C-alpha cells in the first residue's frame, strides 16, 4: 500500500500488473490517495486552507503533478489511476480525513472500485487533514484507523 502519491503509484502498478495478467496482491491499502492529477473533485476547493498539512494545491502540488506527468496527459491512467480499469482488482482499504484536499479522490476511488464490482472499504476520519493519522500517530484517530486497517487485512489475507 501507500499514502498520498504513494497510493496513486500503488494503484497504477496494480492496474499495470492486471493488464499483463501478473498475479496481484490479496489486498491493498491506500491512505489519503492522490489518484487524480487533473484537480477534479470538490475537496480540492472546499478544503483549500482547511487542510493543515497540504494547505493548497497551487504551487508545490501543482508543480509536482506536472513534473511527474511530464508529457503524459494528466487524465491518463498511468498518472491518474482513477481513470483506469479496476476489473479484477484486489480489495482496497481507503482512508482520508474530512479536511484532506484529496478527500474527493478517496470517495471517488471507493465509488470507482465498487462500480467495477470490486471490494472497497472507505474510512473517513473527522477533522483530520492529509495523512494526519500517520503524522500524529499516537492519537485516538490514528489508533482507530490502525484497528480498522488491521481488521481489513485479517479479513482479506
Predicted regions and their residues:
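Alpha/beta-hydrolase superfamily serine-hydrolase fold, recognizing
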Residues: 1-157
Amino acid at each position: 500500500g501507500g499514502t498520498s502519491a504513494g497510493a496513486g503509484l500503488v494503484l497504477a502498478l496494480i492496474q499495470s500488473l492486471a493488464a499483463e495478467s501478473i498475479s496481484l496482491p490479496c489486498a491493498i491499502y491506500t491512505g489519503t490517495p492522490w489518484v487524480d492529477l487533473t484537480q477534479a473533485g470538490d475537496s480540492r476547493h472546499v478544503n483549500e486552507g482547511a487542510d493543515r498539512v497540504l494547505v493548497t494545491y497551487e504551487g508545490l502540488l501543482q508543480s509536482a503533478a506536472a513534473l511527474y506527468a511530464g508529457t503524459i496527459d494528466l487524465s491518463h491512467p498511468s498518472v491518474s489511476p482513477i481513470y483506469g480499469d479496476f476489473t479484477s482488482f484486489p480489495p482496497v482499504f481507503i482512508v482520508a480525513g474530512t479536511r484532506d484536499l484529496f478527500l474527493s479522490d478517496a470517495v471517488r476511488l471507493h465509488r470507482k472500485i465498487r462500480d467495477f464490482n470490486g471490494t472497497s472499504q472507505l474510512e473517513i476520519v473527522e477533522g483530520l487533514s492529509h495523512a494526519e493519522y500517520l503524522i500524529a500517530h499516537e492519537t485516538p484517530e490514528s489508533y482507530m484507523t490502525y484497528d480498522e486497517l488491521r481488521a481489513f487485512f485479517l479479513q482479506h489475507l
